């Protein structure tokens, strides 16, 4: 379990997060949603210590995150960004191999897992493994990014607006794929988006942020039927749902 306890972050005169309390269960798909500047990405970056809170603590399995070895923490956490961060001079296979190599996997183990995961995301290794990122579409690059984040079998997968720059068809395909992989591998997924439709589609629970504070945490059905504040009601008022 991941737990934020009274977490705050302050830059000079600006409160980025204020008294954030949130529990994320093992294996849960938690979506953080809110407008730009609401603190979503800040919360995400605190999990692998890219940012440190000025007050409060974040716990993983009962232990403060700041007490974990930083390298081991990051190797146990997958990260997928909006900006597709593949190394341009490395092939698809070489990009994917980076984390397993750091973990000391054999070449055979890396090759087997790479082939397995690329097949799952619809990119057969025989066809795509030797390609450079420049030879892939945006959607294909993001699929490789997902494989790279997952190949090390992380306990936690962090996804920061990973599909917002993609076309509608690619975005929908990757939403379905991400949910399927989350269920198959049983990891805890924390997903940041400003898109309420995406949040409703993916989440087990949604945490709604405004001005550095959490306004509501609940499942999608409750968010729609019983919004806790006018802000939550307005934010989800235009959402398209079944």
Swiss-Prot record:
ABC transporter domain spans which residues? 2-236
Q: Which domain of life is it from?
A: Bacteria
Protein's UniProt keywords contain Transmembrane: no
Q: Which GO terms describe its cellular component?
A: plasma membrane
**InterPro entries (UniProt xref):** AAA+_ATPase, ABC_transporter-like_ATP-bd, ABC_transporter-like_CS, P-loop_NTPase
| Record's subcellular location | Cell inner membrane
Concerning SUPFAM superfamilies, the annotation shows: P-loop containing nucleoside triphosphate hydrolases (SSF52540)
Give the reactions, separated by semicolons, that this protein catalyses: ergothioneine(out) + ATP + H2O = ergothioneine(in) + ADP + phosphate + H(+)
Which residues does ATP bind? 34-41
Q: Which UniProt keywords apply?
A: ATP-binding, Cell inner membrane, Cell membrane, Membrane, Nucleotide-binding, Translocase, Transport
Q: What happens when the gene is disrupted?
A: Lacks ATPase activity in vitro. Does not import ergothioneine.
* GO molecular function terms noted in the UniProt entry: ATP binding; ATP hydrolysis activity
Q: Which Pfam families match?
A: ABC_tran
Q: Which GO terms describe its biological process?
A: amino acid transport; quaternary ammonium group transport
Its function?
Part of an ABC transporter complex EgtU required for the uptake of ergothioneine (EGT), a natural low-molecular weight (LMW) thiol antioxidant. Probably responsible for energy coupling to the transport system.
Q: Tell me the protein family, please.
A: Belongs to the ABC transporter superfamily.
Its quaternary organisation is: The complex is probably composed of at least an ATP-binding protein (EgtUA) and a transmembrane protein (EgtUBC).
Question: What protein name does the entry list?
Answer: Probable ergothioneine transport ATP-binding protein EgtUA
What is the organism field in this record?
A: Streptococcus pneumoniae serotype 2 (strain D39 / NCTC 7466)
